[in-house]
Amino acid sequence: MLVLSRKLNEAIQIGDDIEVKIISVDGDQVKIGIDAPKHIEIHRKEIYLAIQEENSRAASISNDLLAKLSSQKK
């Protein structure tokens, strides 16, 4: 993991298209701004993990349903 220090209003560039800027610092809370193309999905980590879990659950249900449907056709 690359660890970088930034001050207020300083930024980090990721590739050609993504900029991460420090917007404010208030105690232990840091607000960042992310400028990225619209096709790049950006989520807080806990939201991303919840999305992944829900997608896995939905895929599992779909596979179970597909298996039941194919066994009924026989």
Curated annotation (Swiss-Prot):
GO MF term list: mRNA 5'-UTR binding
One GO cellular component, as annotated: cytosol
SUPFAM superfamilies in the cross-refs: CsrA-like (SSF117130)
InterPro entries xrefs: CsrA, CsrA_sf
Keyword terms: Bacterial flagellum biogenesis, Cytoplasm, Repressor, RNA-binding, Translation regulation
Tagged with keyword DNA repair: no
This protein's record includes keyword Magnesium: no
GO aspect biological process, one term: mRNA catabolic process
Domain of life per record: Bacteria
Disulfide bonds: none
Annotated localization: Cytoplasm
Oligomeric form and interacting partners: Homodimer; the beta-strands of each monomer intercalate to form a hydrophobic core, while the alpha-helices form wings that extend away from the core.
Its job: A translational regulator that binds mRNA to regulate translation initiation and/or mRNA stability. Usually binds in the 5'-UTR at or near the Shine-Dalgarno sequence preventing ribosome-binding, thus repressing translation. Its main target seems to be the major flagellin gene, while its function is anatagonized by FliW.
Family statement drawn from the similarity comment of this UniProt entry: Belongs to the CsrA/RsmA family.
UniProt-listed HAMAP family: CsrA
Record protein name field: Translational regulator CsrA
